[in-house]
């Protein structure tokens, strides 16, 4: 058993803590799939806002500054909190869903290298058609 398991910081433990937090405040009526999806989008936008006008080089160094590092970590936590609550409400196992998606993408987008770089031949059919997604 890891320290995370003991403190409830594994995924299931965090989902329980979030559910208990909402229940203690009578927030469950507001935690509908639509509302949680909207809140997730808002929080993801707040994460993006931190990086909006940064150059790629500045973005790579964002965690070097304690103030911006704290903001990024807080927004990541907000995104994860709403995603976990969304999964709880809909009965989705987030780790199983991610593993299944990675499996599908490995089939959809096989590795094909040409000259050490993934060129047009290295892209899956859907990606060439503009349908590629993570």
Regions found by a protein language model. Name each.
Residues 1-134:
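Flexible "arm" and connector segments at domain edges
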